């Protein structure tokens, strides 16, 4: 799975209408491209991962999903260790907090596959215990 950039491509305003129009068209193109990349990232998940994503979506990301004893809905400490990648800490609306959700049911302990859900509605996937993240929503 390809890793998606975590930057959100913001642009400033310009007083020139032709320049502003050009920038607006560029922003639409960039947003469409960014959204397509997120859809492509989601589509690269395995069927099991997509199924679990849909179960969490249906439950409103409120913790455990039916038949799934796992660690779901616990606080994810963004940048909490030296080996962890760092997710965006803020957006235009303020601070973003994150919760983690296991993907696989294991008999003992936990594996490295997780969804990380942001308070801004974003969802990231990691299969290497937070070393890398791919945005899927």
Regions found by a protein language model. Give the residues of each.
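Low-complexity, glycine/serine/proline-rich disordered segments
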Residues: 1-78, 83-84
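Functional cores of ribonucleases/endoribonucleases
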Residues: 54-137
């Amino acid at each position: 799975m390809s890793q998606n950039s975590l930057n959100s491509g913001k642009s400033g305003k310009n007083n020139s209408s032709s320049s502003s129009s050009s920038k607006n068209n560029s922003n639409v193109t960039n947003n469409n491209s960014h959204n397509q990349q997120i859809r492509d990232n989601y589509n690269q998940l395995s069927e099991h991962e997509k199924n679990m994503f849909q179960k969490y979506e249906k439950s409103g990301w409120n913790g455990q999903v039916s038949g799934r004893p796992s660690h779901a809905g616990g606080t994810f400490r963004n940048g909490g260790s030296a080996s962890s990648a760092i997710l965006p800490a803020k957006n235009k609306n303020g601070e973003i907090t994150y919760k983690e959700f296991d993907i696989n049911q294991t008999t003992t302990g936990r594996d490295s596959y997780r969804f990380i859900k942001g308070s801004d509605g974003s969802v990231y996937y990691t299969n290497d215990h937070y070393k890398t993240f791919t945005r899927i929503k």
